[in-house]
């Protein structure tokens, strides 16, 4: 039988292939003939294949079943006329179509064209070309598989670029979208309907953004954003992020900051995806950023192989105590104070393993924060271990953990502050220190913690925040935040000859008067120039200030103002701070159980300002502990086996009350304060504030305070629509245009510390030497603060600080005169009342330098009025009959010349003159004042 079948032709009617069966299931000899084999060889093959005679063992095992391919299987296809009869009921072979064959073919082609058009419309509606995928499992949207004649659009079955022609039912853009040679190819920008379909999320958002076509869509939009975005207020039309990329490269950084508010304005849907599914979206954005940056700067990849995208200005600011399960795997923004910081540890990023049995190197395996790498078996020897990490070929990344606690001002009354752990990676390492208040933008994730399960008795996941962007609240006006427009504005402002007076007026504008304190605080905030002679002898450049005076003279308010305005200002009180609280403490870390150092207020204020209120209430032991910090600006520690030195390079501004509550000018300075000479000599400026009863000054002060309260009300006065960003905290700012906005003052202060380093000249040094020698001679006669060498250094520091206010790189005579004036005011204010007058006469040419002459002339005029009253009382025995008191202008001019004041016209037109109820009579050359208004 086999030989007969093998002799038949494949096309014979009796062959299975002619009957329409699949010849792959038949023996080779029955499906096709080979010209290379003879009949004997073919028969031999047939004997082995077709004549399959089973063994007896197989018959016993397979008793059931039938061999379909036996010797007689072809009999199933023989012709049987009696059985090959079909019913004719219901079957009509007649054709009613009267068309000819040609017309029928034309109609068939037209019907096929209609079907093709219908399928294209359905495909565009349900699944646009942008989402076509050859590997899609959705049969509802699978293109039609009916075999129709498809004519290629171009010759040779392809396009000019050499791409293969489209398969039937699949458009050419579909093939280009699934081409894996280019991850992110640009699509048709005019395909609005396809872009609309990209926002129709199918399934969960995380799964949606991980699809290849969606990743390509996000990459395209983000690349366009980086290369085309222009700020609305940018008149030059500069591309914002190209400029930021150039600044990032020039600063040798690897983090590109993206403003979320700008991004959501251009691409709102993708920005929402970034907030709700940040991990996959950030991966795409970082890949695009690397490609864009390395295209603009090809050699930068030799410096940084990885670019990180940092998201700034996330609009939602969550509280730590309000974070819930709904925030998991989303981007959040929280704030708090850093309470603990771990060391820097290496974390696996790209790991390779060695098989201990065969020595094969397995990997690389990529480790991330969301999954753990586990090797199942060796690909070489198929063993299941053991495996060891290949240290040489494994790549690590930096890892650090912070613990932040809710800020004291945000904790509800009666509640304990909550805390949360923050993970820092890569270039975010050491971006914050304990004690600093920071804001963290990151991904809220969870990890398995076995200790929590053991403690709670049921499965619990520990939650952490993987930081993406960290900013300090004190660094809002740091160097990289100063734009070119800010720098230009600051440089123009420094050309104002009255810039120092404007800065002093801008210090605590809500506090009336106290020009000497405001001048001292301004000098301390700008600071002098630090010197380190050949790395052996270091001289501090920070200026220390002590405010000593009666209660109610706004000493604490000045400190609070400096805390908000100064850079890295730390506020503490003398009674609430111990010695270790000011310097440093040694304690055991609760995690590692090792002795660690925790810095105090002076350490946390490094390169800033430390503010100490109630300085006189400190214990003597605690006060002695800051001696080293105030002069050498370092803190030495030798405790628990830790011998080290911490940096405390900061200005100290302290406030204290005199003995008995009020300052008595009839007593010496040592009798008024309980501070020793070693601590007093470390203060560069001493400001003695006395609450003196003066009806004119008191009336002006009362008017200022009342107006300040009235105009600060939500619906009171004319300041209802005032801008709070101007930082004007009182009524003085509304009438005085010379007061600088507080934001501008902060930027001016930052700019001066970054770019201005003044130097002292030889002529100025000689002048300082002369004044110092005279002060030493006068201090031996008085009972105030003794003048030491430190005060000479203080004058140098104040000269440099005054030069910084003008943004000058050198010290001029004007700066030296200002420093001498401030030091003389400080020295004279500590003397007894009788000695003060003598010293003012001796140094009056320095004391009156650049002082507000109006207040000085007002004091001189009041003295002349008092003398006139006394003279009239002596002559006539009584002054009750005088309606007004008159003083000659010549007498005031004579007094003013003693203080080198020649022009009195500004004083006569000032508000101080009019508010004191004085009237000017030019015709008679007299100054009149009603006697009934004289209360001094």
From Swiss-Prot:
InterPro entries xref list: MCM, MCM2, MCM_CS, MCM_dom, MCM_lid, MCM_N, MCM_OB, NA-bd_OB-fold
Phenotypic effect of disruption: Embryonic lethality when homozygous.
Matches recorded under SUPFAM superfamilies: Nucleic acid-binding proteins, P-loop containing nucleoside triphosphate hydrolases
Compositionally biased residues, Low complexity: 10-19
PROSITE patterns named among the record's database cross-references: MCM_1, MCM_2
Binding-site residues for ATP, renumbered to this chain: 549-556
Keyword Zinc-finger set for record: yes
Subcellular location: Nucleus
One MF annotation (Gene Ontology) recorded for this entry: ATP binding
EC number in record: 3.6.4.12
Comp. bias regions, Acidic residues: 53-69, 180-190
Zn finger (C4-type) start-end: 355-381
Keyword Cell membrane belongs to the record: no
Catalytic activity: ATP + H2O = ADP + phosphate + H(+)
Short name of any one Pfam family annotated for the protein: MCM_N
A cellular component term, taken from the record's GO annotations: MCM complex
Short sequence motif named Arginine finger, residue ranges: 681-684
Tissue: Expressed in root apical meristem, lateral root meristem primordia, leaf primordia, shoot apical meristem and flower buds.
Record-annotated MCM domain positions: 499-705
Taxonomy, superkingdom: Eukaryota
Stretches for region Disordered: 1-105, 126-190, 711-739
Role according to the record: Probable component of the MCM2-7 complex (MCM complex) that may function as a DNA helicase and which is essential to undergo a single round of replication initiation and elongation per cell cycle in eukaryotic cells. May play a crucial role in the control of de-differentiation and cell proliferation processes required for lateral root formation. Is essential for embryo development. Is involved in the geminivirus mungbean yellow mosaic virus (MYMV) DNA replication, presumably in conjunction with other host factors.
Remarks, miscellaneous: Over-expression of MCM2 strongly reduces plant and cell sizes and inhibits endoreduplication.
Assembly mode: Component of the minichromosome maintenance (MCM) complex, a heterotetramer composed of MCM2, MCM3, MCM4, MCM5, MCM6 and MCM7. Interacts with ETG1 and the replication-associated protein of the geminivirus mungbean yellow mosaic virus (MYMV).
Record protein name field: DNA replication licensing factor MCM2
């Amino acid at each position: 039988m086999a030989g007969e079948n093998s002799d038949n032709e494949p096309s014979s009617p009796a062959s299975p292939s002619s009957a329409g069966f699949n010849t792959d299931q038949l023996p080779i000899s029955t499906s096709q003939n080979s010209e290379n084999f003879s009949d004997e060889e073919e028969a031999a093959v047939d004997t082995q294949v077709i004549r399959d005679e089973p063994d007896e063992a197989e018959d016993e095992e397979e008793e059931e079943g039938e061999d379909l391919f036996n010797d007689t299987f072809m009999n199933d296809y023989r012709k049987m006329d009696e059985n090959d009869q079909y019913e004719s009921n219901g079957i009509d072979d007649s054709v009613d179509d009267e068309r000819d064959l040609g017309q029928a073919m034309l109609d068939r082609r037209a019907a096929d064209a209609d079907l093709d058009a219908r399928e294209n419309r359905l495909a565009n509606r349900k699944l646009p070309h942008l989402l076509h995928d050859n590997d899609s499992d959705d049969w509802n949207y699978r293109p039609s598989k009916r075999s129709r004649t498809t004519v290629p659009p171009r010759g040779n079955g392809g396009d000019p670029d050499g791409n293969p022609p489209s398969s039937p039912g699949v458009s050419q853009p579909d093939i280009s979208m699934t081409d894996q040679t280019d991850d992110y190819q640009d699509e048709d920008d005019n395909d609005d309907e396809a872009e609309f379909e990209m926002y129709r999320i199918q399934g969960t958002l995380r799964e949606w953004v991980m699809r290849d076509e969606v990743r390509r869509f996000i990459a395209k939009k983000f690349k366009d954003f980086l290369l085309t975005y222009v700020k609305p207020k940018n008149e030059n039309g500069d591309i914002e992020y190209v400029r930021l990329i150039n600044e990032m490269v020039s600063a040798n950084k690897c983090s590109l900051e993206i403003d979320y508010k700008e991004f959501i304005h251009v691409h709102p849907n993708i920005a929402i995806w970034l907030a709700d599914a940040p991990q996959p979206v950030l991966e795409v954005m970082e890949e695009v950023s690397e490609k864009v940056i390395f295209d603009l700067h090809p050699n930068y990849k030799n410096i940084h192989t990885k670019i990180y995208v940092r998201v700034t200005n996330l609009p939602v600011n969550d509280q730590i105590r309000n974070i819930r399960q709904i925030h998991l795997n989303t981007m959040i923004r929280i704030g708090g104070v850093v309470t603990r910081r771990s060391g820097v540890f290496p974390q696996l990023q790209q790991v390779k393993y060695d098989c201990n049995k065969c020595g094969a190197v397995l990997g690389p395996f990529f480790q991330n924060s969301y999954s753990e790498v586990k090797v199942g078996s060796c690909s070489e020897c198929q063993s299941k271990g053991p495996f060891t990490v290949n240290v040489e070929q494994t790549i690590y990344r930096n890892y650090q953990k912070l613990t932040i606690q809710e800020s004291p001002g945000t904790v509800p009354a009666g509640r304990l502050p909550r805390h949360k752990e923050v993970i820092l990676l890569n270039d975010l390492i050491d971006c914050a220190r304990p004690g600093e208040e920071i804001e963290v933008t990151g991904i809220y994730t969870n990890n398995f913690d076995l200790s929590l399960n053991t403690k709670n008795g049921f499965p619990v996941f520990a939650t952490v925040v993987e930081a993406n962007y960290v900013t300090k609240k004190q660094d809002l006006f740091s160097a990289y935040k100063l734009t070119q427009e800010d720098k230009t504005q600051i440089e123009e402002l420094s050309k104002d000859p009255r810039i120092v007076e404007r800065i002093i007026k801008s210090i605590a504008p809500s506090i009336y008067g106290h020009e000497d304190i405001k001048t001292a605080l301004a000098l301390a905030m700008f600071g002098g120039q630090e010197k380190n002679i050949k790395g052996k002898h270091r001289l501090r450049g920070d200026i220390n200030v002590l405010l000593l005076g009666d209660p109610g003279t706004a000493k604490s308010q000045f400190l609070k103002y400096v805390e908000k305005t100064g850079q890295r200002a730390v506020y503490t009180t003398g009674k609430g701070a111990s010695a270790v609280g000011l310097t440093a403490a040694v304690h055991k870390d609760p995690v590692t159980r090792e002795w660690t150092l925790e810095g105090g207020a002076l350490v946390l204020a490094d390169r800033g300002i430390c503010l100490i209120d109630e300085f006189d209430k400190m214990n003597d032991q605690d006060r002695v502990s800051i001696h080293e910090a105030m002069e050498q600006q370092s803190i030495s520690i030798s405790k628990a086996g830790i011998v080290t030195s911490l940096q405390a390079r900061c200005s100290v501004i302290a406030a204290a009350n005199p003995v008995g509550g009020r300052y008595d000018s009839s007593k010496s300075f040592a009798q008024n304060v309980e501070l020793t000479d070693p601590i007093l000599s470390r203060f560069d400026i001493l400001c003695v504030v006395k609450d003196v009863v003066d009806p004119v000054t008191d009336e002006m002060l009362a008017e200022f305070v009342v107006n300040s309260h009235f105009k600060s009300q939500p619906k009171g006065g004319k300041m209802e629509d005032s801008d709070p960003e101007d930082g004007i905290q009182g009524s003085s700012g509304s009438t005085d245009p010379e007061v600088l906005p507080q934001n501008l003052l902060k930027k001016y202060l930052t700019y001066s510390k970054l770019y201005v380093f003044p130097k002292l000249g030889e002529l100025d040094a000689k002048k300082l030497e002369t004044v110092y020698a005279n002060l030493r001679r006068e201090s031996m006669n008085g009972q105030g603060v003794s003048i030491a060498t430190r005060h000479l250094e203080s004058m140098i520091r104040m000269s440099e600080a005054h030069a910084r206010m003008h943004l000058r790189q050198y010290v001029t005579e004007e700066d030296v005169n200002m420093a001498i004036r401030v030091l003389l005011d400080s020295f004279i204010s500590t003397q007894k009342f009788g000695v003060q007058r003598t010293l003012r006469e001796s140094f009056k040419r320095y004391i009156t330098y650049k002082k507000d002459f109006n207040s000085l002339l007002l004091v001189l005029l009041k003295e002349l009025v008092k003398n006139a009253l006394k003279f009239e009382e002596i002559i006539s025995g009584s002054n009750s009959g005088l309606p007004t008191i008159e003083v000659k202008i010549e007498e005031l001019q004579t007094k003013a010349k003693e203080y080198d004041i020649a022009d009195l016209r500004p004083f006569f037109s000032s508000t101080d003159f009019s508010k004191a109820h004085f009237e000017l009579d030019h015709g008679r050359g007299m100054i009149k004042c009603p006697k009934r208004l004289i209360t001094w």
